[in-house]
């Protein structure tokens, strides 16, 4: 059954991530504007009591359960068909969001219909003065086809000194925290299911 939603569906894919949910889901619940967003967890047939925990602790978080582990791409593709919303934010289960995180993303997408997808600046959880390897400040592809990010090239991670606070066009937005228009996601037929995990967001944005 398709679930009616608010303007934004914040969607977390989970597989046996109980410890991560305990650590990071509270920030998503506490700092996401309920007026414009709903929170979903798509579960890939977890066996670690993830779902009972969510239902017990977060009654406002909606849960979609798969009958087997479909991986990242197929897990999202199948689950998102059941969620009706203008925008999806695909959020990794190990991401801590901060107060006010949602507003700038929503404002940007609303301001320009030509923007298909976007991401925020993503900082390391363990060292918040540095960028996170997965996505940093936006993704690009070099002339040989290798992906890199503003703030991270190969294993070199930059310190965040505000050098990438400006809005700019990027080649790909990180699946760590990817906001995309739902219509575009479905028109592109979602992620390529041949990507079980990793690199699928680059393929989608391409």
Predicted segments, located by residue:
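A conserved acidic beta->alpha catalytic loop
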Residues: 18, 27, 43-51, 68
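Short aromatic/hydrophobic "clamp" motif used to bind/position activated sugar donors
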Residues: 88
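Glycine-rich, basic loop-to-helix element that forms the pyrophosphate-binding segment
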Residues: 65-83, 93
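Short beta-strand/loop segment that forms part of the nucleotide-sugar
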Residues: 36-45, 64-66
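Short, acidic, metal-binding catalytic loop of nucleotide-sugar glycosyltransferases
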Residues: 26-36
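Conserved donor NDP-sugar-binding/catalytic core segment of glycosyltransferases
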Residues: 96-146
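Short, flexible, basic/aromatic active-site loop/helix in glycosyltransferases
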Residues: 138-170
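A short, conserved alpha-helix in the catalytic core of glycosyltransferases
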Residues: 171-206
């Amino acid at each position: 059954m398709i679930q009616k939603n608010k303007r934004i569906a914040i969607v977390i894919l989970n597989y046996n991530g109980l410890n991560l949910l305990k650590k990071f889901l509270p920030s998503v619940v506490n700092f996401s504007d309920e007026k414009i967003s709903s929170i979903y967890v798509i579960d890939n047939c977890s066996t670690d009591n993830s779902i009972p925990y969510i239902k017990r602790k977060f009654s406002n978080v909606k849960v979609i359960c798969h009958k087997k582990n479909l991986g990242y791409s197929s897990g999202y593709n199948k689950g998102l068909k059941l969620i009706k919303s203008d925008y999806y934010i695909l959020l990794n289960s190990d991401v801590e969001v901060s107060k006010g995180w949602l507003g700038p993303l929503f404002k940007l997408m609303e301001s320009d219909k030509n923007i298909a997808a976007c991401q925020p600046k993503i900082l390391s959880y363990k060292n918040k003065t540095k960028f996170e390897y997965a996505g940093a400040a936006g993704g690009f592809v070099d002339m040989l086809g290798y992906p890199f990010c503003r703030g991270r090239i190969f294993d070199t991670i930059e310190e965040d000194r505000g050098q990438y606070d400006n809005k700019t066009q990027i080649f790909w937005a990180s699946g760590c925290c990817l906001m995309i228009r739902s219509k575009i996601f479905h028109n592109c037929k979602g992620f390529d299911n041949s990507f079980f995990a990793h690199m699928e967001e680059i393929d989608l944005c391409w």
